[in-house]
Amino acid sequence: MLKLLPEPKRAVENRGYTTSFRNIGIGLEALPSPEKQEYLEIARMRFWNRKELGIVPEGGSEGCIEATIIPSLANIEADGGDLFLKQGYYLNVDRDTIVLKYQNKAGFINAITTLKQLLKKNGDGFALPLCEITDWPTVEHRAVAPTFSWYAGYGRIGFDMQLWGYDEWLEYLNVCIDNKINQMNMVMYGYWPFELEEYPETVFRDVPIKIWNKENGRWLTVRYTHPNIEDHFLADFIAMAHKFDFSIFAYVGLNSYNGAYSIKHPEKRMVKPAGSGFMNDFDSVCLSDGENTNYILASMRKISELGFDGFTLEESEEGFWFCNCDRCNERWGRVSSSPVEAKHKANLWLLNLIYKEVRSVNSKAVIGIRAYRQPPLEKDPAFLRECVESMPKDIALFWAPALYVPPTEFKKWIAAFGKERIWGRDTEANAITSTMGRLFRVFESNMIRYRDEPNVQVIERDIEQHITSAQEGVSGINGFMFEWYGLFMFQWAHGNYGWGSKMDRDEFTRLSCEIAFGKELGKRVLVVLKSILTIHESQMPFYTMPFPFQKNKLTVADIPEIQQARLRHPVLLEEIHAIQREIEADPDLAQYIQHFARIENAERRNAVIYEMALASLRYECAVSLEEKERHLDEILHYNEMDFDLVKEMFFDINPVSETGMKSCMYPYHEIKRIIHNMRHPENPDTAVICSGIEALGWLWL
């Protein structure tokens, strides 16, 4: 069997391998002259992680296997229709020659990528398995959604890929293309990671942050600026992506966390209902204020001018209330049956304004929305028809239902909007992991009592949605990749199942690890990834601040499973260390060094969190005040140990509060506040620290 992902549509493996070679000669005689150098350069760049292999003009060097490039798929039988012609390819690898056929540039890129993936080391050279492949995607637009900035200034400053510069983004682009992904929907929430001259206060520049100085054992206040503001690399990155027929979309708010405008101008926020307990009034601005809409339109115009190919506009997740100012009540509130309906109507009005503004800059820009995600999750067909009639006919949907509803709900949306307008679903498991303070969550097995967990988003659910999306023939998939290090399995799943594979999940995870790490090491890596048990600190019973992304509260019935994880930990950690040593010794695996550093840190934290969780359960069972106090001391001790490991590795670890509400993705600070209040009710600290402001819109779960 060919070890190849994404899984090709048709592949025949013939016995044996090519002769050994150190170079591939790219025969471009059949191409028009202007394309020859471009395609040769594309081929060279596609071998970004195979530098020791030369990509040369045909016949250009010794030890060379010749690849004849034919820009035509005529007489190649395939049932892929237009997608075969747009992005498909044909490869025939014989003992001494390669034939590569394609119709369009994307097909050439996909074919060269497959060729690279098939390479086997052979002494001081390489060989390819003898094979014939005819391949094409089932889904045209295969996107991932990474984070360029995420709630910056609102809930955090930045972590993981949000701290990258050009070189890291270029490597990630290459990883995407290796997985035959052809689009990024780059999240930009909070302070803008680009210059907006009309509104400089909204730009991600000189934001104060306290960082841990291990040398002196104290906090230092520094001012942080987004890497793209420092180096202005975004235009070059978009241009590089376009060389590979790769689209870059802006994933921004539809009146939701647009720049730092509602931070710097709190008077522009929506007006909460009088006397309500709602905490998040900083998400959106009042749409009856002309200055606010002017700001939003100026932001969208600027993003269009930066060269993005399209927009993913996300509607606010706050669906329980809507602006209560007199003008918003008059325009939308009084003609709606609920706050969420008023929000939809106001946002559709804004969407039409944005549509015109963006198209005035780029008439070809794709404009899509992520909307209608709040209860009721099963929509009335009449409501969907009204939505269709209220927006331009070419608006794409980057969210369509899947979870928490019966399968018929997806078909209902397809019937209402048309499959060509659906570009994404609820494949957000990686985004859920990214809320958890750098802990590890990929599989069902990483969670305690998964079957009881209200939030079901794990890689298994993402795969199911990709498979059914491909079966229904929708236009696109959108796999969330809000966090990269340690979470590579999500990327592989988005690539494989977005391409149209129906492979068994267990076979996919086994094969993907074997391809990446080799047969023996791959087995060990997969065992580690599936054996990690992650308890989020908020699952301790005394923790009162809602955290909807891992909601099960621990009980004494969970003690045996926690004890098993405790016993497993030393062996698991040593295996992680052994894997790290092998990766560090192999230049071909160097790209995984940071991934396993993150996994190692998460597993060391897990061991501490197990002890803290058990102490919290002892506290719940304690009868005497003395016992309770002793267990609270234990919890605080382990809380400090957990945070010491956080400080050891991560940058953005303290609450941010510019909005007027404190937020931090690490529960450490809120644990201290809660225990202080338990011990000192006469002097309470009332400034709650939410575990990421993204949690506030999910409290319905």
Q: What is each PLM-predicted segment?
A:
Residues 25-26, 54-83, 101:
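Short, well-ordered secondary-structure micro-motifs within conserved domains or adaptor modules
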Residues 1-22, 29-33, 60-61, 301, ...:
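Substrate-binding groove of N-acetylhexosamine-processing glycoside hydrolases
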Residues 261, 265-267, 314-328, 590, ...:
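Active-site-proximal, well-structured secondary-structure segments within enzyme catalytic domains
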Residues 20-51:
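Short, charged N-terminal beta->alpha structural module
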Residues 2-16, 25, 33-35, 78-309, ...:
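Feature activates predominantly on carbohydrate-active enzymes
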Residues 285-289, 315-357:
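Active-site cleft segment of glycoside hydrolase catalytic domains centered on the general acid/base Glu
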